Amino acid sequence: LQMVRFYSAIANDGTLVTPHFLISKPQSGEVAEWESTETGVDETVLADMRSMLRSVVTDGTGAAADIEGYEVCGKTSTAEIASEEGGYKKEVYNIGFCGFIDNSSSNLVCFVGANEVYAMRQTTQIFNDIMENAVKQYNITSMPSN
């Protein structure tokens, strides 16, 4: 959840929001409100972070997370797994992808993690599936880049 909190600050122009699990779309008239905190992070730093996270998706290991017509920003992660015999397990990793859709009507951040797997593409593809569904279900629209 700490990674989601960090990414939400980038996605929300420096406003730090505590993550919440979205179980269902709020009913009409129902408003969900949570506390937030301004971080005071410089706009230039936030723009640089978004640009770097976008390049992971456009030019790097996060390509499978991209959604046509949207600016997906995110980062893959890989961790070796300690072996009981010493050293690390061979060719199996704990992996993840955390990201958001920049320049959109949404503040959603999504983290997908998988333990003891062989391929990075699994988490990026699952992120893509989740966020494409969210785009449709919550009518998320893309906005012009700044």
Spans of model-derived segments:
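Active-site beta-strand/loop architecture of penicillin-binding DD-peptidases
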Residues: 1-35, 53-142
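A conserved catalytic-loop motif detector
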Residues: 8, 41-45
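Intrinsically disordered, low-complexity repeat and linker tracts
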Residues: 144-146
